[in-house]
Amino acid sequence: MLDFINLINNINNPTSPTKITPKVIPIKYEIKDILVDSDEEKYECDICTLELFIESEPKALQCKEGHLACRRCWERYLSTNKQCMTCKTPISSISELSRNRYLEKEYSNWLNDRLVFCPNSNENVFRLNMSGLPAINNSNQTLHQDLCNHGAMKFSELQNHYKACESRILQCNLCLIKFCSKDSDKHQNECSKVYSKCEFCNSNILRSSLSDHHKTHCTKYLIECPHCKIMIKRDTITKHINDDCEEIMITCSEYLCGKRFTRSKMQIHSLEHSVTKLMNQNEIIKKDNQNLDQEKKIEEIKLKLNNLLNNYIQLKNEIAVLKQNSFKEMVYSNKWIIPEYRSFNALYTHKKSKNSNDFQVGSHTFYIKIYPNGQAGKQGKFGVFLERKPRYGILLKYMFSFSLLPPEDSTATKVSLGPIHRVLILLLIDFEESRSLSCGTNVFTDSRKVLKDFLNEKGELEISFSITIQDEKIIPL
């Protein structure tokens, strides 16, 4: 008889535990569960009425006189009685029973020609085999979508069908979740136990821990300086605060005045001290200037004053450049890929919109909103907008752009918007907490042109976008 369970186990291909190499879950079922016509009574045990032949080992055993029963019934009966249950022939152990090879061969020939359904098309069998461990799809609604719909076939053809059956039950070797073979690619992209490369520090982090890694551990993740609000890499924040932060208060130590200023103002304060001191010296020299030597000293002081002034101007320029360069890292570019866009377009009719997932640019939260078939009054036009969730009490200067790229084999041309520059001043009294800030266009392109020219071979629509934070300042309340 066909060893169906061993066949399934041979399909498994285990590899390194750090990769997703799902194994096939051996399917458990009874022949009557898959037969098209249930007329197998001839091969049922007369005692328990269950199947005589299941799995790989022979279950039908007989005594010396030919009385037949399944192995389960023999084991149960011989545990308390050492004789045949029919003819009472003495039997000391189950090893004295024999197989009925003629009946086994007859059953095998009979079964191979029977019409059967795939075990994965039986809801009860499928539900039973999906139980015991977490499963991706285990609700009644999704269960029916996972059942095999191949139709009837000969039992002898079942093994070849099962090798390619999309409803074959697999189990992830990493997270132990069960799923159907057709969902392999989906699980590959969603498994919480897969390691992903952190986009900031390039460390390999569990996908389920990536968000926590960014919030607490990633040394290259941009965090906000609590004093000057500039975004700084986590591993340089201490040095930034100790040596560079322009808003840290420090005490004047050069001229014993004891005054406290922010670091940005302390440099100017020191220059003012130097200028004042030199000016006082200049006044004294002027009063005592009675010879050419005194005139020479005055010229020297003027030269020093001029040098100090040049240093003062250079320092102010360096501070301005330093502030400007602190925003160079606040540039974000990405793509929003919408799968099965034709179905998506049919669902989001005129006036209906769809939002992308939120994304962070520095300390600011944005998302993309599209109108596949137009806003009110713009039916048939593809609208796209950049939405920003408000963060109050700041002046924000940024620019953004959108573009649709046609597939490589298309003759269509790229459609772009931007770069568009925006300057926002957000006070606490201006907006409600839930309101977002929108900018974009409701006539980006024609909705039908999107369907015709911009879908790739998978039916996906790719929207490329880029956002650059150019400047931000805190506005006192």
From Swiss-Prot:
Q: Where are the zinc fingers (RING-type)?
A: 45-88
Its predominant location is cytoplasm
Zinc finger regions, TRAF-type? 160-211, 212-267
Asked if Nucleotide-binding is a keyword of the record, the answer is no
MATH domain location, by residue? Answer: 331-463
**Record's PROSITE patterns?**
ZF_TRAF
The compartments listed are: Cytoplasm
* Gene Ontology CC: one annotated term: cytoplasm
The residue stretches assigned to a coiled coil in this entry are: 271-326
> What are this entry's molecular-function GO terms?
zinc ion binding
Keywords attached to this Swiss-Prot or TrEMBL record, sorted alphabetically, are: Coiled coil, Cytoplasm, Metal-binding, Repeat, Zinc, Zinc-finger
Family, per entry: Belongs to the TNF receptor-associated factor family. A subfamily.
- Function of this protein? Probable adapter protein and signal transducer that links members of the tumor necrosis factor receptor family to different signaling pathways by association with the receptor cytoplasmic domain and kinases.
What name does the UniProt record give this protein? TNF receptor-associated factor family protein DDB_G0278133
Q: What's the source species for this entry?
A: Dictyostelium discoideum (Social amoeba)
